Structures are given as C-alpha cells and as structure tokens.
C-alpha cells in the first residue's frame, strides 16, 4: 500500500504554530527542487515555475536541484537549462543516482563550481533522439530540426564542460556512461561529494 507524500510540520514566518505540509512543499521553501523522473512538459513547467517564483522571492540565495532521472524531452531539458541560466540565483545541481540524457544536460547546466555528483552516481550523455512519420517533406524537416538541436546541445555541452566541440560531437554519437569521477574529469560536474 503506497504511503503517499509524507507531511512535515512547517511554521511560516510570523505564525505562532506550525502547519502540516507535504514534504515537497516544505523543501521548496528551502529552495530544494527535484528532477527525479522522466523530464516531460509537466515536470519541466513545474521546475520552471518554481525557479522563477523562488528567484523573484530572493535572488541572492542558491537553488538546489537534486537529479535522479533517465532524462526525457530535449525541448523540456533545454527550457529548464535556459531558465537556470536566466534567473539571477545560482543553481547548484546534485546527481544522487543517475543523470542520463537530458538530465545530464541539466546537471551540467548548474552554476560553475556548484555541480556535484554523489560518489556512486552514473551520468550518461548521448545525442538527442527524434522520430517522425508522415510525408517525406515532414520527415526531412524533422530530421533537419533534430540535427539543429543536436548541434545546439553539443555547443552547450562544450561550453559547460570545457571539452572541444569535436570530442563532444564524437561522444554524443552513442551512449557514453560515466562514473562520478569520470564526469568530474570530463567537466560535467565540478566535484564528487564525500561524506
């Protein structure tokens, strides 16, 4: 039987007593967000909305995004990345399990010096996928768009990791799995957390 989302006590500033709120709402108040499932439109919009709200509330305090995700939509990942870089608050990204595909892109998109992987994390990069059906002109158009996005993603990875674009392009050709230490050496994260 599922237990649901746990409730925890939380006292709002100026309130005499605590209220019971769900764990995630409590953590949002501490500027902690989660990317722990497939990155789809709904999750991307939630993350973007929360980041914009928390940034408007306090621009000088860091946001923390904990990542354990197989990835998801390329356009959603780019939207989250763009928002992370649009807001004034620094964004610390932390891989707590797996950051694959667009989740690794979000991980790499954290503020330089504040991208962390736990010691047994796995990070995977690969090229964006696309699939189309229909008339030849539609398939060609979709293919051109996928290649444009691939170039865009490759340039961003190169910028964020310090790796040459030629190497990034080669590495994106197939799934590249990295340990936390390898991800640090590659430049996707800045540090491997220790206890």
Curated annotation (Swiss-Prot):
UniProt subcellular location: Plastid, Chloroplast stroma
SUPFAM superfamilies from the UniProt entry: ClpP/crotonase
Entry keyword annotation includes Plastid: yes
Taxonomy, superkingdom: Eukaryota
HAMAP family reported in the protein's UniProt record: ClpP (MF_00444)
Record's subunit section: Component of the chloroplastic Clp protease core complex.
Protein name (Swiss-Prot/TrEMBL): ATP-dependent Clp protease proteolytic subunit
Gene: clpP
């Amino acid at each position: 039987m599922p237990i649901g989302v746990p409730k925890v006590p939380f006292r709002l500033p100026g309130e005499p007593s605590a209220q019971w709120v769900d764990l995630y709402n409590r953590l949002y108040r501490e500027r902690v967000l989660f990317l722990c499932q497939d990155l789809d439109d709904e999750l991307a919009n939630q993350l973007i909305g929360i980041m914009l709200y928390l940034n408007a509330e306090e621009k000088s305090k860091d946001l923390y995004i904990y990542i354990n995700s197989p990835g998801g939509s390329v356009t959603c990942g780019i939207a989250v990345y763009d928002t992370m870089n649009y807001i004034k608050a620094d964004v610390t990204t932390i891989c707590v399990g797996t950051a694959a595909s667009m989740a690794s892109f979000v991980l790499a998109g954290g503020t330089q010096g504040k991208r962390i992987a736990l010691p047994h994390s796995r990070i995977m990069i690969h090229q964006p996928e696309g699939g189309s059906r229909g008339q030849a002109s539609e398939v060609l158009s979709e293919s051109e768009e996928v290649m444009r996005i691939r170039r865009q993603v490759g340039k961003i990875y190169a910028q964020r990791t310090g790796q040459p674009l030629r190497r990034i392009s080669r590495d994106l050709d197939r799934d590249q799995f990295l340990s936390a230490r390898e991800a640090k050496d590659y430049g996707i994260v800045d540090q491997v957390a220790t206890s």
